[in-house]
Amino acid sequence: MPPTETLRPGERGTAGGPGAGAPEQTYIVRQSNKYYEHRDSQATAMSVDYSGQWVLLAGRGHLALQRLGQDDGSLRRHERQSKYEVSVAEFAICPSRKEYCAIATSQHIDIVRWGTAEPHYEMSLRGHTRTVTDIDWHGKDPNLLVSCSIDTFSHIWDLREPRKPALSLNAVCMSGATQVGFNRVSGNLLAAAHDGDLRIWDIRKGSCPTHYITAHLNRVHGINWSHKRETCLATASQDGTVKYFDVCNPRRAEKIITTMSPVWRARYTPIGNGLVSIVVPHLGRGENSLLLWSNSKQTDPICSFVGHTDVILDFAWRPNRESSNEIELVTWSRDRTLRVWKIDDNMLKLCEPSAEEIESRFEPDLSELRVPTPPEFLHPRSILVAASLPISTGDGACNTLPMARSPSFGGGYYRREEPHIARSLTDQPTCSLHHEFSLLNTNMPHVEVDTLDAIKRYACFKICAGGHTVILQVTFTTSYPSPSAPPDFQLCQGTTLSSEVSGVLLKVLRCNALQRVKKSRTCLEQCLRALVAAMKKKVAAVGGADRSQLLLQSPRLEGALSSTLHDACIPYPRTSGVHFNAIGMLTTFAQPVNNKRLTLRQHTALTPRTFSSINGSGLLGNVMATAQREANASFYLQERMISGKPGKQRAIRQMNGSPVVHVYDTSSLLHISRRMAREFSLDKCNIAETCRKNGEICRQHGRLDLVPVWLLAELIATPQIPHETLNDLLFYKDPFKKSLLESLIMHYAISGDIQTAVLLACLFDKCPTGGGAIMEKTVRLPPQLNSQISPYHTVLPLDVKSSSSSNTWQQLKQLRSNSWSDSLDLEIKQIQSDAYACSLIRRTKMPLFDQFKRAYAEILFGWQLLSKRALILKHTQNTPPPVQGVEFVTECRKCAKPKRTPKCEPCKRPVLFCVLCRLPVKGAANACLACGHGGHIDHMMQWFEKHNVCATCGCKCLERTSELLALLS
């Protein structure tokens, strides 16, 4: 792995040139060269154009241009009306579009072309659904622009086709994108920040990111690609660090700058070997630091730019097209001041590494080049290193390579980059021992970490593999990981290996450590992995482990436990569960007690998708068993008849290692009882007697708490006033009885005793139908039906006296003619309203009580009490009213039957087709009531916006439909 160097900014050092013997860097405090104050400007974004003459200040109320060459400080202000602040503004960086700039406001991006007089709005890019957080222009193609948003998308726009993004990069994550940037060397790579993570995309293949980098612990505020190296970038974060990354080695940062406050921006200098960062103090209390760092050494900043009194919002580099030896830094702050800082040649020299540092750093590589081994001599990296090394002369002087012009910054001044940047950063000195310990993988298989002491510079580990244990102590020298200082390894007391095997393992450790430290790389984790592999191989060769213990490392087990870390998005199979059903049966299953759950640290296979595959592969099976069962686990108990001896009954034999499904009867813990449900009565001939009988049933089954309830129900059903015997309708109009009954039903329904609640609701639901006096007095037919002659010739006479009250309704319906009778219909409605009147349950409560009855009917179905269930369902008469309205009746083309649904269920074919697009209609539809033609509602609206006749038959659908609807209303 590449080394990591974590450095903190120190105190101000002493001045010294590059050739001074002191290692401290010069800490310069620099004031701004130019200063512009705009107190009335509310700009929140800033950008410098391609020529370096104009600075754009963009805000919610205006766009302003400041010419840097003028000393009067006047602004070219252009008003704009927007209720949102400008989140970011960027000028194009290609000369062919140098007058274009992109301004992001809320969810859209405006492309503005600056003319001689006023800005011209060329286009608006709309594709994001949340606020746009960052934009960046392509460095090679002037037509490409990338934007990112909180909606997690990064859109690449082509200005030649601005209606939609040319490419959308979707990061499947919960956090939005905060920063985005194109690669400055090739332009093919793109980096997007999502909180503390980075996604590296290749725009030639936008289906998925090419690299995932866990960069910071907090949000990333800035991304900047290197101007010289294609794969290197720097990030600034809320956690107070600036990190250098190489996307070829995304696992760890190359170098780290640590500050005491959040870092808002960090960008490479266009020339030289520096980086500028903005440090924002916590809660605005502290110094608003604008610091220049060297990429080769991060102990101290090179320069501090002072002058701003508030938070620096943004900064940009001002290219000098006439003189490329100098660059200028332009900053805009919340104190409403625009400052210009000059980066002179002395600052750029301080960013370069000293000659002593270069020579001391690469002396080991020179020694390797004198006696090269064939593989390393032919390695391309070795050739690159040899080409970038300083040239040694006989007198000890060191001649460096001549300076060159930078092709990436207008052919300007280009300082010789330090050799360790010209080659891969993986070969530079590594981080401290403390940082190496913090990056150590503590979940390595077979390895337990006992002690990690960075102060005393030693570590202790316990390795268990192949049935043996090794206690390893590693001691690090102060110069580790220099090529001449590998760590020292020692096997301590507690090691169970023989002296011969221990010597072989120590030799393996020293060889691996020497190979790593020769390249100034860390070696601890690689040595531990090599030790585990050598222990397995050596112990298996000498036969020093018991076979039963080696079963733990069998290929079958390793195959089952492998590569599960790659299946992080796949849910692990359920190994236990519990579920209730409606009648109180509890079903449970779990893994067997004798099964051993193993750790998931060593994974080389996929995560099992089902519980049976777990047991089949041996992941949860008894791996210490001598015999392995090849069959998959089954959730079912196998019932087999034991033959051979008479009188033997059926036995259940459980398979070895298979889970058992347990079914428990928990009905005794609930408020319902199957035995009581079988005996309960719903006889309505005498409701009081029925209540007395149900109360006695509760007493017999030990439910003494329900006896007072049925006693109250008996009192409700008993008439209390003599007048009620003359007219039983008075019995059902007692408000006290209605309130008491509804309170009892709701109390037991809420408490979970749905059985008692439903029985009470059914008993007092409606009038008795089996010869009760109330029904006989309620159903009184009109006088014309009592006579033997019907007023209509098509209605047969009805003998009401000979008919019972139970089938009166059916006779009335059967004897109706097709002609309409006012008197008969009115009387039937009156009879139905009287039937509702003879009930102690209000009509508004009936839908709720019907739901209780249907739920209790499902419980009776589970108990197989079908007759009781049918009796309960007879009392659910409050069905929802049919939906009334205009329906589209279409005819199926196959069966030629009229259908009121969009699909013919028997034929499995759609029946409603749009007359415009000829496609089946599955969503909102509309049709003419006169001609019947219609289709998708969107297509119909688009058609009738320009036409007033039907597209099929020429019918004036709008007028005819309005007339028919007026008649219906």
Swiss-Prot record:
Signal peptide: none annotated. Transmembrane segments: none annotated. GO terms for biological process: cellular response to amino acid starvation; negative regulation of TORC1 signaling; positive regulation of TOR signaling; positive regulation of TORC1 signaling. Residues 435-538 form the RWD domain. Zn(2+) 4 binds at H933, C950, C953. Zn(2+) 1 binds at C892, C895, C904, C907. A zinc finger (C4-type) spans 891-911. Zn(2+) 3 binds at C928, C955, C957. The modification Phosphothreonine is found at T373. Component of the GATOR complex consisting of mio, Nup44A/Seh1, Im11, Nplr3, Nplr2, Wdr24, Wdr59 and Sec13. Within the GATOR complex, probable component of the GATOR2 subcomplex which is likely composed of mio, Nup44A/Seh1, Wdr24, Wdr59 and Sec13. The GATOR2 complex associates with unmet in the absence of S-adenosyl-L-methionine; the mio-Wdr24-Nup44A subcomplex is essential and sufficient for this interaction while Wdr59 and Sec13 are dispensable. This association acts as a nutrient sensor to inhibit mTORC1 signaling in the absence of methionine. Gene3D superfamilies: YVTN repeat-like/Quinoprotein amine dehydrogenase. One of its GO terms (molecular function) is zinc ion binding. Its main location: membrane. Coiled coil: none annotated. A zinc finger (RING-type) spans 912-960. It is found in: Lysosome membrane. Disruption phenotype: Flies are viable and fertile but ovaries are significantly larger than ovaries, due to increased activity of the mTORC1 signaling pathway. One of its GO terms (cellular component) is Seh1-associated complex. WD repeats lie at residues 127-167, 172-211, 215-255, 258-303, 307-351. This is GATOR2 complex protein Wdr59. It comes from Drosophila melanogaster. A component of the GATOR complex, which functions as a regulator of the amino acid-sensing branch of the mTORC1 signaling pathway. The two GATOR subcomplexes, GATOR1 and GATOR2, regulate the mTORC1 pathway in order to mediate metabolic homeostasis, female gametogenesis and the response to amino acid limitation and complete starvation. GATOR2 activates the mTORC1 signaling pathway through the inhibition of the GATOR1 subcomplex, controlling the switch to cell proliferation and growth under nutrient replete conditions and during female oocyte development. SMART domains: WD40. InterPro entries: RWD_dom, WD40/YVTN_repeat-like_dom_sf, WD40_repeat_CS, WD40_repeat_dom_sf, WD40_rpt, WDR59-like, WDR59_mRING-H2-C3H3C2, WDR59_RTC1-like_RING_Znf.
